[in-house]
């Protein structure tokens, strides 16, 4: 068999989140990223969604390692769940490792997992793969792209990136290395499509710092800033701005406290001296000396900002003496929850600053011109747009065509497809690996499927009606009047007539059935279910879930 490299995305295509890509070469496998996605509005009770890794479980003896580009949830969120199924070593940078360790500790997996920290610029040998770590800019520190070297050629996997010429840590993206790889020849490029709809360049993270300085200077109120917990450089800039005008900073919200602790311990966040204080200490200080950094930029229900807005926060009570700055844009789908929190803050007399035009947030993803730079530097033979919804992948393809790429060398695939690259050819094999969604609900992983969700949706929309029936084991006679129990369907006290009709209907259905010989209880249940459902739909235009319960005595 001729040499072949297979690239199999298991998540991250035609969606935002749960990024995961499998590379297979010479009978060996490496996995890049292992993310989760937020549940949709119709996924009742689901905590998060992770990729289906049955393909990896099937081939677990061939996996040589998992490589992580950076520490965002859509790239590391599924790590603990996947490690329970396949225990493989993890290779990543220091901050990413610190954030993964937090997760593994929660799941009791820290002892059994091998995490190897790698500096950008270094190369890791994993079986027949050599994976080179290349520094990039993004909205979390210590992000990398990978150059995956194989016998067939080199694949550049950008991960999430932007080109920031004035990053907070002074570490500019290693464009020179992308250019060198391009000179040596890049077999394929997989690049971030998130911001391909936006022309121009993404603004530098530093512009947000200037906004903070402007909003902090001369402000007489307490300042509360919410942003993504993982945005270490944003939090650093808040601390710097606070110190400059003589304010103290306290952090609240579990994920924010965890991330800032890890980032400070590892030296990625360097707060000015004596600036950071405990949340319980800051309360006794004058309001104009306080800055509070909090979670909740997406309006999440149990987040610290949400609890402040709805008067449920243990330490902080907000009111007219407060200025809240929302330093994040709403992730698509979260707009309603964010405006709910903003409205509640307004109701309490809080000044809320959340305007996009105010340079309160910059994206961590490359816009069109930056993507063109990466394409021009790497000059790939083949191109696979990743990390985006269908329109983004299509637009990224158009951008590559503008850059002079050959149409037949660009492939837009779906999760579970395999892109097979040979010495002279590339083809996409649809549906090569299973790649559905696995739902996490509490401790259960994958035990809630489409059927359970359908039931939850049904219950949420129309409620349920339970029909309880006792019949004689001897002759099938009814022993008592049927009992009707409803939940989430009607208010019983106002609907006695309807319930009596249901009892009568159930009795007549059971009577009709009694005459039948070889009585099958399931048949009776089915008959009652359809009679009651049909009647209720006619009477109320609703279709609750009907559960007949029959006991033989």
Language-model region placement:
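A glycine- and charged-residue-rich anion-binding loop/surface
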Residues: 13, 37-45, 62-63, 354-357, ...
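Short Gly/Ser/Thr- and Asp/Glu-enriched loop/turn motifs at secondary-structure junctions
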Residues: 119, 414-416, 542-546
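Hard-cation-handling environments
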Residues: 198-327, 331-356, 360-517, 525, ...
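His/Asp/Glu-rich metal-coordinating catalytic cores
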Residues: 2-67, 72-284, 303-317, 336-340
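Solvent-exposed loop and beta-edge segments used for protein-protein assembly and interaction
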Residues: 15, 140, 286, 459-461, ...
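Short glycine-rich phosphate-binding loop at a beta-alpha junction
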Residues: 89, 384, 547-548
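Conserved hydrophobic residues forming the short capping helix/wall of the S-adenosyl-L-methionine
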Residues: 104, 400, 536
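C-terminal tails and terminal domains of large nucleic-acid-associated
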Residues: 517-553
């Amino acid at each position: 068999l001729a040499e072949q490299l297979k690239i199999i995305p298991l998540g991250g295509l035609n969606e935002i989140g749960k990024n995961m890509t499998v590379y297979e070469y010479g009978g060996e496998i490496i996995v890049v990223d292992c993310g989760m996605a937020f549940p949709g509005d119709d996924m009742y009770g689901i905590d998060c969604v992770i990729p289906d890794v049955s393909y990896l479980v099937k081939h677990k003896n061939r996996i040589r390692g998992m490589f992580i580009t950076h520490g965002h949830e859509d790239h590391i969120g599924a790590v603990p769940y996947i490690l329970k199924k396949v225990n493989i070593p993890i290779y990543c940078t220091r901050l990413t490792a610190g954030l993964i360790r937090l997760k593994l500790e929660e799941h009791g997996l820290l002892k059994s997992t091998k995490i190897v920290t790698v500096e950008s610029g270094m190369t890791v040998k994993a079986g027949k793969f050599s994976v080179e770590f290349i520094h990039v800019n993004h909205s979390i520190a210590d992000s990398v792209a990978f150059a995956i070297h194989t016998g067939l050629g080199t694949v550049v996997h950008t991960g999430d990136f932007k080109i920031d010429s004035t990053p907070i840590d002074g570490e500019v993206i290693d464009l020179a290395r992308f250019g060198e790889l391009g000179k040596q020849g890049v077999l394929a490029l997989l690049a971030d499509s998130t911001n391909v709809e936006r022309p121009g360049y993404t603004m530098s993270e530093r512009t947000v710092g200037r906004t903070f300085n402007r909003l902090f200077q001369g402000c007489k109120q307490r300042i509360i800033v919410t942003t993504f917990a993982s945005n270490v450089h944003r939090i650093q800039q808040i601390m710097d701005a606070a110190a400059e005008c003589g304010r103290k900073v306290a952090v609240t919200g579990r994920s924010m406290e965890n991330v800032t602790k890890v980032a400070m311990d590892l030296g990625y966040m360097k707060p000015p001296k004596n600036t950071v204080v405990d949340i319980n200490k800051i309360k006794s200080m004058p309001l104009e000396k306080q800055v509070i950094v909090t979670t909740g930029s997406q309006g999440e229900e149990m987040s610290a900002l949400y609890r402040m807005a709805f008067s449920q926060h243990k330490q902080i009570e907000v009111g007219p003496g407060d200025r809240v700055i929302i330093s994040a844009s709403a992730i698509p789908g979260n707009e309603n929850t964010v405006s709910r929190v903003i409205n509640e803050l307004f109701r309490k007399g809080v000044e809320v600053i959340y305007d996009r035009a105010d340079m309160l947030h910059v994206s961590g993803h490359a816009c069109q011109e930056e993507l063109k730079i990466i394409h021009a530097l790497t000059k790939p033979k083949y191109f696979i747009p990743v990390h985006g919804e269908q329109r983004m992948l299509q637009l990224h393809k158009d951008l590559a065509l503008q850059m002079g790429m050959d149409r037949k060398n660009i492939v837009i695939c779906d999760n579970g497809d395999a892109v097979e690259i040979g010495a002279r050819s590339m083809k996409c094999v649809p549906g090569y690996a299973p790649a559905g969604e696995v739902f996490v609900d509490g401790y259960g992983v994958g035990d809630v499927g489409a059927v359970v969700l359908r039931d939850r949706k049904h219950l949420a929309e129309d409620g349920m009606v339970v029909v309880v029936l006792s019949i004689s084991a001897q002759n099938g006679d009814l022993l008592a009047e049927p009992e009707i129990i409803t939940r989430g369907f009607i208010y019983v006290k106002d609907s006695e007539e309807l319930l009596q009709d249901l009892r009568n209907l159930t009795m007549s259905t059971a009577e009709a059935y009694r005459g039948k010989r070889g009585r099958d209880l399931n048949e009776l249940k089915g008959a009652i279910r359809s009679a009651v459902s049909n009647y209720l739909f006619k009477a109320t235009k609703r279709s609750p879930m009907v559960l007949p319960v029959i006991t033989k005595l």
